[in-house]
Curated annotation (Swiss-Prot):
Keywords: Exonuclease, Hydrolase, Mitochondrion, Nuclease, RNA-binding, Transit peptide. It comes from the Eukaryota. One of its GO terms (biological process) is mitochondrial RNA 3'-end processing. Residues 503-843 form the RNB domain. Residues 1-54 form a transit peptide. This is Exoribonuclease II, mitochondrial.
Length: 957
């Protein structure tokens, strides 16, 4: 698809939404009510209404129109057919509120232009500048708006629906490699999703962005637009306000460019004034940088934009953290990089100089050598490098290769063509067609010439994902190993326990740890304590490293820098040195009295917390079971199994001792009561298939391209892919206990007014149709809140990711409104480590040791950014290896897979393949996509691109 077609697609979609809105306004009905009544009268006729939404999608899939003439002709033909059909069907529907004259008047507007195709083109040109308000009275608009909003009648639900954006705000959007774009907010488009903003840029073009793309928001800049008296969800711009808005946008853009030129030297001084080497939190607030550059505490919008543009263009020096509410708090200084200037390399590429042609000759030879001699067998043995010493790289060739690798890594995250990669690929004889070059193809070329490994995920080598210990950055890896060895000597003697005198002896209780058999650090265990009739306490015991290590110590700083234990299929990087963790803090260490911080709750029959305690404790040696053993034990109990399994019940507990079953069943009952409380507040868990990738050998080396010769490899690792069908019963029980500890932790922090790291998830704003879909989701939850994927398809795009906050916030999917603080993994998550430190300052009555709220707020953006980066790259790596597994399947095994077709107006249709646990894109025509939306279908694999993280499927024939 070319850029012209993409441009048409975007604007025709706006056109179709505009037409649908005009119909609904004429009928004084919302789209959801109109569709329901229309479908009830004649079920097959609902497709007519869908025309308005899918017309613009025709060029997005498969058969694109050859040119604009065909595009507009097709739109016109569909609309002409719809006119008479729609009026007839409205008559048959017998809708009392339908004004047939208004409907005919609407369609007469088309006929007055004579040529429907020309009318659409004229209308398109107008809407390309801005959507003009329909001629309706204010009362009609407000009445219709009330119908659209369809406020929830769920308990306190509407109180969560606050808006961070308003009409008239100046928005700065991040466009990736294209930089930033200025726009004026015109509202929230109810025809799409509530977390999508509609805006107009300085060219007068209407565009839609997700709120996560907003880098900066300056409120009330466009006062005339702000004063427009229409609902926020009406995203059109009155014609008298439009010219002023565009003119002001251009003025702001021009002033920002002028400031960028005049303050260039001040911008560069930021690096010398604020960048302090070897400082952990090497950052500065955005407001401090503004004061430094402009010498004022109240900079103008264009001053902010000018500085922001500089920080983004110098991305090798700066990192702007995730902006939860579109207000940049911190700017982080990245370590000085060793990036070379590649101007001489680019010049040689353009001129096709002799050194460059010599490289091309070597590359052709190596491609042939690779195909003849180095075909990788699959093996579980250690992977060893095989150096091809017959070819030696010159200094120019090494630099050229570094440049090509850098460009290939950048290519893996963007679809823009790269002329230099295309040139090299073509001149070595690999470009045999006119299709665009993919990062997967170029990675294969680099593998063939011995400077890359076929199992290297390109995005893992991006600077923002550089993680010490993963093997992608030798300098960071060396620092990580050196510090681990240093701490091993530092804590050689027994560490002093600061909470020793306060610990409660709970060794009389059985403590159960439910972890995988491969887990090397046990950081939580569960006990139950019966104190009489219906008086039970559930105890969650958590490893307590902060009692022996201060958060401000070098080891605490080491944990903060690593932030989390990283679990990748080929590598695990521990937040704290593993040998120290296993010896001193893991709950399965050799000590007879394990030290823990115990979170206890007394739970009512309705699952409410009647009382809670947070105490340092001694617990007995933990009793370890795997989740699989727990699951089989729970299913073997008749009173539990009769509601969750069918067929004969296995009487055996499969490895769980009979002496332990009473406590385990009581843990099950109490955790289910706690879950019941959250279910009343609309908690849910979407039970999607989840892939788990295992590699043998599990320590797979990377080719860092730093040798003088090409390097090949002895074998390819063995990949096994295991797919879980969703949450098991055991996982639900364990998860509920951990959530309960988070609830108790939140209560403790609020009672003692402690600065803490709360976790929240915003409540989405839903229109009537999606509200109904969400109610369907809730009504199909299991007794543990699990929801099958098919019930979540239409509302899943509305759900935002969770985030960290310094004050108690609601968590949508957990059904928690009174705050939630994760606290059960201090050996694996620094935020939990921080939580334990704060609690300890209260227990020891040492308020001076408490981390102040101001310092915490200053670091939250960094923590959010780190958590997001770790989560993003973790998903990418797991998917990369899953796609490698699929790519290497024998052709005969690429058979039929199944899944539900997910259709969204903001993205191409996708499928969650149940047997593989991965999402895939599908090439399908829009009419067929809407017809099959949310239905389970059979699919075949079409193409696999692991480096780009893309899987394409087609409907099985």
């Amino acid at each position: 698809m070319n850029y012209r077609q993409l441009f048409l697609l975007q604007n025709v979609n706006l056109e179709s939404n505009y037409l649908l809105k005009r119909v609904c306004l004429s009928l004084k009905l919302s789209p959801c009510k109109l569709t329901r009544k229309f479908h009830h009268a004649c079920p097959s006729s609902s497709k007519v209404l869908k025309y308005f939404r899918i017309t613009g999608c025709l060029i997005n899939f498969g058969k694109q129109p050859a040119n604009d003439h065909h595009l507009w002709g097709h739109c016109g033909a569909r609309l002409k057919h719809t006119q008479s059909d729609l009026i007839d069907r409205f008559k048959n529907a017998n809708l009392k509120s339908v004004n047939e004259e208004n409907l005919k008047k609407f369609f007469s507007e088309l006929e007055n232009h004579g040529n429907i195709r020309q009318w659409l083109k004229d209308k398109f040109e107008k809407d390309k500048r801005a959507a003009v308000c329909p001629t309706t009275t204010k009362s009609e608009e407000e009445k219709l708006e009330n119908d659209f909003e369809y406020s929830f009648d769920l308990e306190d639900f509407s109180s969560e629906n606050f808006r961070q954006y308003d009409r008239g705000d100046l928005l700065v959007f991040y466009r990736g490699s294209e930089g930033i774009e200025l726009a004026a907010c015109t509202g929230t488009n109810v025809w799409n999703y509530s977390n999508v903003l509609t805006s107009i840029n300085e060219n007068g073009t209407i565009k839609e962005f997700r709120t996560s793309r907003v880098l900066l928001r300056c409120p009330n800049v466009f006062k005339k637009l702000k004063e427009v008296q229409q609902p926020l969800s009406d995203v059109s711009v009155p014609s008298d306000v439009l010219p002023f808005t565009i003119k002001l946008l251009k003025k702001i853009s021009q002033r920002a460019q002028d400031l960028s030129r005049s303050h260039r030297n001040e911008f560069l001084r930021i690096l010398t004034e604020f960048n302090i080497p070897n400082k952990l939190d090497n950052s500065a607030s955005f407001s401090d940088l503004l004061k430094f550059v402009y010498k004022t505490s109240k900079p103008s919008p264009y001053a902010k934009i000018s500085l922001l543009h500089f920080l983004l263009t110098e991305s090798k020096h700066f990192l702007i953290s995730d902006h939860i509410f579109s207000e940049i708090q911190k700017v982080y200084f990245l370590p000085s990089s060793q990036n070379d200037s590649f101007d001489d390399v680019v010049a040689c590429l353009r001129q096709k100089s002799t050194p460059y042609l010599s490289f091309i000759k070597k590359a052709r030879h190596l491609i042939q050598v690779s195909r003849d001699k180095y075909k990788l067998p699959i093996s579980t043995e250690e992977i060893k490098p095989v150096v091809y010493s017959q070819v030696t790289w010159t200094e120019f060739e090494k630099k050229l290769l570094r440049y090509l690798v850098q460009e290939m890594i950048a290519k893996s995250i963007q679809s823009l063509p790269n002329t230099h990669l295309c040139q090299v690929y073509k001149e070595v004889g690999l470009q045999t067609h006119e299709r665009g070059l993919t990062s997967d193809q170029f990675a294969k070329f680099l593998t063939d010439i011995g400077v890359w490994a076929s199992w290297q995920p390109p995005r893992l080598f991006q600077q923002e994902y550089s993680i010490a210990g993963l093997g992608t950055n030798p300098q960071l890896d060396a620092v990580y190993e050196r510090e681990c060895n240093h701490f091993k000597k530092f804590v050689k003697n027994e560490l002093k326990d600061s909470l020793e005198s306060q610990r409660v002896d709970l060794r009389h209780l059985k403590a159960f740890a439910f972890d995988s058999s491969s887990t090397k650090e046990i950081d939580d265990a569960i006990s139950v304590e019966e104190l009489g009739m219906s008086n039970s306490w559930l105890h969650i015991h958590v490893a307590n490293p902060t009692s022996t290590v201060d958060i401000r110590s070098p080891l605490g700083t080491f944990a903060e820098r690593n932030f989390q234990t990283i679990y990748h299929p080929n590598k695990i990087v521990y937040m704290l040195p593993l040998n120290i963790t296993q010896k001193y803090w893991s709950l399965d260490s050799s000590s007879t009295a394990q030290r823990a911080l115990t979170f206890s709750a007394k739970i009512s029959k309705n699952g409410d917390i009647l009382d809670y305690k947070v105490r340092p404790s001694f617990i007995s040696s933990v009793i370890k079971y795997t989740p699989q053993q727990l699951d089989k034990a729970l299913h073997s109990n008749r009173s539990i199994a009769k509601d969750i399994v069918s067929g004969p019940v296995d009487e055996e507990t499969k490895g769980v001792s009979n002496d332990h079953m009473k406590d385990i069943l009581r843990i099950y009952e109490l955790s289910k009561q706690a879950c019941f409380s959250r279910l009343q507040k609309f908690a849910f868990v979407i039970a999607q298939p989840t892939p788990t990738v295992e590699l043998l050998p599990n320590n797979v080396p990377y080719n860092l391209g730093d040798l003088n010769h090409p390097v090949y490899w002895s074998s390819f690792p063995t990949i096994s892919l295991n797919v879980s069908e969703g949450y098991s019963l055991a996982e639900s029980v364990i998860s509920e206990c951990m959530i309960l500890a988070g609830r108790v932790s939140s209560l403790f922090f609020q009672e003692h007014k402690l600065p803490g790291i709360f976790r929240g998830q915003p409540y989405p704003i839903m229109d009537g149709v999606r509200r109904k879909a969400f109610e369907t989701l809730l009504s199909n939850r299991s007794s543990w809140g699990l929801v099958e994927t098919k019930y979540s398809l239409s509302v899943m795009p509305l759900f935002e990711s969770s985030h960290l906050a310094s004050t108690p916030v609601s968590h949508f999917s957990l059904g928690l409104k009174d705050g939630y603080i994760q606290s059960t993994s201090p050996l694996r998550r620094f935020t939990d480590f921080f939580t334990h430190h704060q609690i300890q300052s209260v227990l020891l009555k040492t308020p001076k040791n408490t981390i102040p709220d101001g310092i915490l707020r200053g670091k939250l953006n960094l923590y959010n950014q780190k958590e997001k980066s770790i989560k993003t790259i973790g998903r990418y790596i797991n998917r990369f290896w899953a796609l490698k597994y699929i790519e290497r399947l024998p052709k005969v095994q690429k058979n039929i897979y199944h899944g539900y077709l997910m259709v969204s107006e903001l993205s191409t249709p996708q499928v969650m393949l149940e047997e593989l646990g991965v999402k895939a894109h599908i090439d399908i025509l829009p009419d067929e996509a809407f017809r099959l939306a949310n239905t389970r279908q059979a699919f075949t694999i079409k193409d696999v691109f692991p480096e780009s993280n893309i899987l394409l499927v087609a409907l099985a024939t």
